């Protein structure tokens, strides 16, 4: 009985100590969406290069997430794998932001992953800094039942046809337009625009098949371009036109569709709520997506073949994501005496 009481008392003291421990003041959060196999030593997903090259060696349980967290020995850089799709992105970000182990009030959050890229705007292996994140809340009818002059069957919830002249984002769903800190995004772009990104002969040969798409044929480069998040894994010429129109519509002509992915509006929705709770600072968020594949088929091929093909640029995109993202993160964390209280570019 005495042993039981002692065990209970020690457990109570341990709980008090855990709650009393000061949260770690994180400087940078690296947000990725998937990893394949192990975090180190095998074929990489989005997380592995960060783990290996930034020495995120300490593994932390993450009960509200889908994958353990990792941190460096100084507890200044924190890495998360969110899981793919909007629901996982939102839930994982909320779980991280509410975790009492971490002080994220001054942390810079880098959302860093691969994506489809619009061949009108960029090439496989290229890296796009987003100024806007656009969501996919919409109405849709099968285009076979749509009027013949409709370009596609998707349109805003407050409209009666695709691509109306203008739109307002209804407050109640808070999910289709997220504007990032333009000054910080421009600063990040300026820090990386001259980087020489890795290339690959096989990828270069594939790019060359995108005739009449000069941006798609370029070697990998850094650009400013916005991202469209959707739980639909869509593909093709018609859907790329839809995405281009959709981004332009929701940003009132200021945005340019560059990349397509399945998470970022979920991340930003959670971050907005965490910002209102004083858990994070939404002005310290960056979104970097790199092209692993094109969002539409190359000339002379069809969309089904294209969407079903392996990603020829996956490894290239992963390397670009780390190179460009880490360049900015290193600048932020090594100049912490300045960047802690003063956001670059502002």
Pin down the residues of each PLM region.
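Accessory terminal and edge-of-domain segments that mediate assembly/interaction
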Residues: 21-346
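Bacterial N-terminal signal peptides
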Residues: 7-15
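Bacterial Sec-dependent signal peptides at the C-terminal "C-region" and cleavage site
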Residues: 14-22
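Positively charged n-region of N-terminal signal peptides that target proteins for export
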Residues: 1-5
């Amino acid at each position: 009985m005495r042993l039981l009481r002692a065990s209970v008392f020690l457990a109570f003291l341990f709980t008090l100590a855990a709650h009393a421990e000061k949260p770690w003041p994180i400087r940078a959060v690296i947000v990725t969406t998937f990893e394949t196999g192990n975090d180190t030593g095998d074929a990489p997903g989005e997380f592995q290069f960060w783990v290996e090259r930034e020495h995120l060696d300490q593994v932390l349980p993450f009960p509200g997430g889908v994958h353990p967290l990792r941190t460096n020995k100084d507890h200044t850089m924190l890495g998360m794998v969110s899981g793919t799709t909007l629901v996982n992105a939102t839930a994982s970000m909320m779980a991280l932001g509410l975790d009492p182990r971490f002080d994220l009030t001054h942390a810079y959050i880098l959302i860093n992953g691969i994506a489809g890229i619009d061949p009108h705007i960029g090439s496989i292996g290229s890296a796009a800094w987003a100024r806007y994140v656009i969501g996919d809340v919409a109405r849709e009818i099968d285009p076979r039942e749509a009027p013949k002059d409709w370009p596609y069957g998707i349109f805003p919830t407050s409209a009666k046809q695709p691509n109306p002249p203008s739109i307002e984002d209804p407050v109640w769903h808070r999910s289709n337009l997220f504007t990032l800190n333009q000054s910080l995004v421009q600063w990040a772009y300026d820090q990386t625009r001259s980087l020489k990104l890795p290339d690959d002969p096989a990828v270069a040969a594939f790019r060359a098949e995108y005739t009449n798409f000069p941006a798609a044929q370029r070697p990998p480069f850094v650009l400013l371009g916005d991202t469209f998040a959707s739980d639909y894994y869509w593909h093709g010429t018609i859907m790329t036109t839809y995405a281009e129109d959709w981004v332009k519509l929701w940003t009132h002509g200021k945005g340019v569709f560059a990349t397509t992915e399945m998470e970022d509006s979920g991340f930003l929705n959670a971050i907005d709520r965490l910002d209102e709770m004083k858990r994070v600072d939404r002005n310290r968020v960056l979104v970097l997506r790199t092209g692993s594949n094109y969002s539409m088929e190359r000339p002379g091929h069809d969309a089904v073949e294209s969407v079903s093909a392996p990603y020829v640029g996956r490894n290239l995109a992963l390397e670009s994501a780390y190179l460009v993202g880490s360049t900015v993160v290193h600048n932020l964390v090594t100049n912490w005496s300045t960047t802690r209280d003063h956001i670059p570019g502002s």
